[in-house]
């Protein structure tokens, strides 16, 4: 039987999904209670965009083995990608109940809560993740995002700064940190982190406009002009480019 499973898995790895579906069904003829095979079969169906069969076989997998963490993750992902956040949440909540020590499920549940703007619920799950994994920097980043959305800018800054101790290669991290400093009216630190975002990725368009605006607000007109001009060199809508060019001209007039 192991040979049949290996064959089905090999077909799947080769992206021969329809053939792998047939092969998994052949296994189930003699192993009708194999939860892992049902899970793999469901994944294969999801790869050919057969939502109905994928849902059916993920559900069957969990009926046979309520402790199969990957099936909860896969089924919730199926619902999430279809836009059914309520079912994604329900699946992960059940998985979290069955597997209270599985922090991967807890973290995924937090992220679905974030997408559904259930901020307080997300905080509960993220804090649970961080209690068990105090160096989970993705969870710190997500918690920073939630704090920002709730207007807790000090909390957002604290969480994002924690992540920067571990990662210095993410323009989005520095951009998020800069936004939090800006919202907290700490303009110098906001500028510093927008510039760090650009240093990591000099094609990150949004940071150029943001830092230019802050330079302008600080009356650093030469720097504002420099970054606005850099911004207009990117592929941005013509209307936006014309608007920024007019702003540059007004700044130059103000300089005299």
State each model region's role.
Residues 14-22, 48-60, 82-94, 116-128, ...:
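Structural signature of tandem alpha-helical TPR/SEL1-like repeats
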Residues 30, 64, 98-99, 132, ...:
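Structural marker of alpha-solenoid helical repeat scaffolds
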Residues 40-43, 47, 74, 108, ...:
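Canonical tetratricopeptide repeat
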Residues 1, 35-36, 69-70, 102-104, ...:
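Helix-start (N-cap) detector for alpha-helical repeat units in TPR-like alpha-solenoids
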Residues 26-47:
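Short, charge-rich amphipathic alpha-helical segments embedded
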Residues 1-7, 221, 225-256:
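Terminal, low-structured helical/coil segments at or just beyond the last alpha-helical repeat
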């Amino acid at each position: 039987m192991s040979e049949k499973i290996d064959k089905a898995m090999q077909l799947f790895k080769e992206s021969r999904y329809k053939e792998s579906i047939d092969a998994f069904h052949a296994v189930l003829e003699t192993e009708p209670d194999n939860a892992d095979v049902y899970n793999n079969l469901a994944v294969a169906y999801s790869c050919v965009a057969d939502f109905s069969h994928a849902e059916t076989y993920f559900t069957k997998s969990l009926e046979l083995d309520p402790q199969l963490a990957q099936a909860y993750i896969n089924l919730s992902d199926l619902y999430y990608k279809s836009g059914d956040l309520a079912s994604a949440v329900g699946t992960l909540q059940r998985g979290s109940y069955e597997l209270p020590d599985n922090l991967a499920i807890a973290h995924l549940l937090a992220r679905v809560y974030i997408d559904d703007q259930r901020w307080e619920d997300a905080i509960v799950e993220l804090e649970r993740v961080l209690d068990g994994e105090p160096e989970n920097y993705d969870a710190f980043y997500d918690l920073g995002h939630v704090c920002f959305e709730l207007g807790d800018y000090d909390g957002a800054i604290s969480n994002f700064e924690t992540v920067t101790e571990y990662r210095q290669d993410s323009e989005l991290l520095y951009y998020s940190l800069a936004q939090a400093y800006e919202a907290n009216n700490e303009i110098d630190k906001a500028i510093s982190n927008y510039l760090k975002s650009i240093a990591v990725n000099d094609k990150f368009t949004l940071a150029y406009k943001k830092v230019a605006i802050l330079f302008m607000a600080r009356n650093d007109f030469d720097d504002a002009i420099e970054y606005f001009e850099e911004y207009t060199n990117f592929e941005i809508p013509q209307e936006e480019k014309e608007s920024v060019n007019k702003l540059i001209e007004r700044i130059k007039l103000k300089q005299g």
